[in-house]
């Protein structure tokens, strides 16, 4: 997609050891992020938010360019996000496909500015119709410049977490 050959990243290794750890307790030694936001209401909003999430539109809405081996997030899909000259390679670790929860986690590959994993999911509450987006991540600096930049990297991560949640809210017909 989008002109970049992502096949060279298909054989790239994860640049962290705790692959899949967003399924359980966070491993020690990382910075942690947990954010949630009500993004809509009703089943139509859930479907719209889940589609935006799974088809990379959340990332596009946050201002990133997408280069992916797949049109949507599926296990082992490689996605290289670009922000100007910065390449941010990731691979989908697992997908959540439940009636009231949709999402995926991806892990950082060699060459990513950070090391770690990020889980994105959208939940629908049949009780009250609330659609809530969740972002959970653990990371540490993965390159010399992110180690040197320290707090700047955390601010950038917080900025993009907010942008992701806003993009999912905008995907809904009754955004909050």
Feature locations, PLM:
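Hydrophobic ligand-binding cavity/cleft-lining segments
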Residues: 1-83
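A conserved amphipathic terminal alpha-helix motif
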Residues: 5-6, 10, 141-176
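A structural signal for short, well-ordered beta-strand segments
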Residues: 35, 135-137, 164
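Short, intrinsically disordered, mixed-charge
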Residues: 50-58, 97, 111, 127, ...
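A short hydrophobic beta-strand element
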Residues: 75, 100-105, 131-136
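Conserved active-site beta-strand-loop modules that form the wall/rim of enzyme catalytic pockets
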Residues: 77-81, 89-90, 133
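Hydrophobic-ligand binding "helix-grip"
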Residues: 84-128
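Beta-strand/loop substructures that line and gate deep hydrophobic ligand-binding cavities in soluble
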Residues: 109-155
């Amino acid at each position: 997609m989008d002109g970049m050959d992502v096949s060279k990243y298909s054989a790239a290794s994860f640049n962290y050891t705790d692959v899949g750890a967003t399924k359980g307790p966070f491993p020690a030694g990382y910075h942690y992020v947990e954010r949630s936001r009500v993004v809509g209401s009703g089943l139509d909003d859930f479907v719209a938010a889940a589609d935006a999430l799974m088809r990379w539109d959340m990332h596009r809405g946050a201002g990133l360019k997408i280069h992916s081996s797949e049109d949507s997030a599926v296990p082992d899909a490689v996605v290289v996000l670009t922000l100007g000259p910065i390449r941010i390679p990731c691979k989908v670790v697992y997908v959540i496909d439940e009636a009231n929860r949709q999402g995926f986690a991806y892990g950082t590959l060699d060459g990513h500015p950070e090391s770690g994993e990020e889980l994105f999911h959208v939940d629908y509450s049949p009780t009250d119709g609330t659609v809530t987006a969740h972002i959970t991540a653990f990371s540490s600096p993965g390159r010399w410049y992110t180690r040197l930049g320290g707090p700047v990297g955390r601010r950038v991560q917080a900025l993009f977490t907010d942008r992701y949640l806003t993009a999912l809210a905008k995907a809904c017909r009754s955004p909050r």
